[in-house]
């Protein structure tokens, strides 16, 4: 009950295969384009059996920790909306917008270094408003206006808006945040902000965690006090450049 896309097929047992699954590509294979090839020879020659953006989807009910409210026809309250881009510098690990309007701007300013999941060259910075650029079916400025209109209708019931960046790097190009399951530590801070049980540091870009407010128990050797400072740093010079870049991008979108 799983759907795979852009993967290779092992024709002997009709199972999916992709680079990274294991180091044994099937000999009797069909690549992601539908070509029947010898997988071992094909990959040895430098070719890829699967597309770099191969995916799978499975029923949500397969998740062992799914909420009992998942299928509630009345819906559930949304407390937080979380945007995120892939940035090596500039953007801190997490920050909260000042308001819904500011949060809409934060979402519109999302940008990422391109990966295999996006068309084009890898590592090039591209604007990706709300991470919706490949999926937005109408003019992006109208999409932003829709968000602002939603805020007017929601009033004080509007969710709080946050931005995360798991990909900040140190001066040697190494990721400073461990990611994966440790991202729950940031979500824990976000939940506490929504509950109003924790304060935050007001900065020019939004509200940031106060030092020590993100639970780093168990990863102190990896995320040291110095690393924590770097993860939450707001470099004003970099952000001035970011503002100018966004002004240029908004002028482009507005044409």
For the regions a protein language model found, what residue spans apply to each?
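Charged, heptad-repeat coiled-coil alpha-helices that serve as long linker/dimerization "arms"
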Residues: 226-230, 241-248
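Carbohydrate-interacting/catalytic domains
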Residues: 237, 255
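Conserved small/polar residues in nucleotide/adenosyl-binding loops
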Residues: 250-253
